[in-house]
Amino acid sequence: MRYLLIFFFPFFVFSQKDSLKISIENGRLLYDDFCVRCHLPNGKGEIGIIPPLADSDFLYKHMEESIKALKFGGIDGEIIVNGVKYNSRMEKMGLYDDEIADVMNYILNSWGNKSDKIITEEYVKKLKN
């Protein structure tokens, strides 16, 4: 049994890395279609109006809330991102759970962001408003 695990483990690891790579690429395309207008190509948003996604302390501290914002349409009330207050509500984009996962994987691995967490469709699907 141990030999089977040793044999299959590299394929499992490769498969995870490969699926993340595909998710990030799909997320990039979706970001360009749905997010770039407000958050800009560099993910920096507009200070005080549109929160940044690049180097965002909020994304890491409030991961689930960030995903819910994408899934259900914004966050109610004021948030503070990198020390700056924001109080504008993002529209619901109408993305499917797998697309939300892809966009989040792209955001979490772009513009200097690096996450070892893979957001999956199943994870997004379980989130309730």
Model-derived features: where do they sit?
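The canonical Cys-X-X-Cys-His
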Residues: 27, 31-41, 103, 107
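Hydrophobic residues within well-ordered, non-membrane alpha-helices that form the packing/core
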Residues: 10-11, 31, 107, 128
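A contiguous binding-surface segment within folded domains or other stable secondary-structure elements
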Residues: 37-78
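Axial heme c-ligation environment in periplasmic c-type cytochrome domains
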Residues: 47-54, 75-129
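Electrostatic cytochrome c docking/interface patches
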Residues: 13-30
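Stable alpha-helical elements in mature extracytoplasmic
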Residues: 23-27, 62, 66, 99
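Sec-dependent N-terminal signal peptides
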Residues: 3-12
